[in-house]
Amino acid sequence: MAANDSTGTALGLQDIQSGDPRVHTNQIKVALKELSDHVRRDVEKIEDQRARALFETTAEVLDGLHNAHDHFETRSEPAWK
């Protein structure tokens, strides 16, 4: 996975020109993990129980997406083989 010419976005993601999906999935995994960690930290700051539940659910969904990208990269699921 070589570096490519790229430009950043507001989220800190690079607009990578590579056609290799692993380059893109790796970047997306990093962003999903960072966002999930951020949301989990925010849960501790919020008193509203419904909002806490929403944020916890958000983190779980982001973690699931991270895992799906990981499974794609490692070809660990039958769908990706």
What is the predicted role of each segment?
Residues A3-D37:
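N-terminal acidic leader/helix
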Residues Q14, S18, E44, A51-R52:
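Generic alpha-helix initiation/capping and coil-helix boundary signal
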Residues V39-R50, E73-S76, W80:
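Secondary-structure edge/capping motif, primarily at the C-terminal ends of alpha-helices
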Residues Q49-E60:
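Short, charged, amphipathic alpha-helical segments
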Residues L62-S76:
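Amphipathic alpha-helical coiled-coil segments
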